[in-house]
Amino acid sequence: FQKWVAISITGVDYSSRKEKYVSNEDINIIKEELLPGDILLKRNNYQLTNMGLPGFWTHTGIYIGCLEKLDKYFNDIPLGDCLCVSEYVKVIYPKVYDRLCNESDGEYIIEVIAPGVVINSLDAIAKVDYFSALRPKLPKEDKLKALFTAFESLGKAYDYNFDIMTDNVLFCSELIYKSYLCSRNKKGLTFDLEAKAGRLLLSPNNIIKKFDAEFYSENSEFDFVIFYDEDRKS
C-alpha cells in the first residue's frame, strides 16, 4: 500500500506556474559552478509528495557532470592501466559510460527516483523552484571512489520502506549516505541518522541541517557551492 501511494502521488503538482523559478539561463550558470561529486538538493512547491517528506528539502542526488569534465577534474588520479576516468568507466561501468555518451543531455546526475537508481540530465534536479549544491571537503580520490560506489548501484530499485539498513534497494538520500560512507580505503562523510517509525533515516533536509550545524566549525564537512530560490540567487 505504501508503495502504491508513493507512486500515485509522485509528480502531482498543484502549481499554477508553467515554469519553475530556476530558469534555463540559471542552469547554464549552475553548470559552471558544479564539480563532480557535489551533492545536489531540490524542492518544488505545491507538489503532493512534499506532504510526506520531513523538512523543506525533498530530494537529493550526486552531480556527475560529463565524461570530459570527469577526465579534467580527476586527471591526476591513477587508475591502473586506464589513462583517464572515462576509459576506466567504459571498462568497469559500461552502462554508466553508455548513458554519459548521450551528449544531447549535456551534464548528468545520479539519483534515486520511482524507477530506481538512474542517471538523468542535470535539468531533472536543477530545473525546480529551489536548488542548492554542497561540496564534500574530501580529496578528489575519495570523491571519485564515492562516484564509483554510486555507479555500482545503477539499476537498483527504489526503497519504498525507507530502510537504510538494506542494500538491494535505495531511496534518494540513502544513495548519498552509502556512496560517501567511510571505509578502510576511502575517507567519507559522517551523518547522524534519525529514528523514524522504527527505522533509521537520513532525509535530504538532514543533509542541509548538517551543513548548517557545522558551518562555523573547523570540522565542517561541506563547502557551500550555490543556492537558487524565487527571491534570491546566490
Question: Predicted segments — roles?
Answer:
Residues 1-234:
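Cysteine-nucleophile amide-bond enzymes
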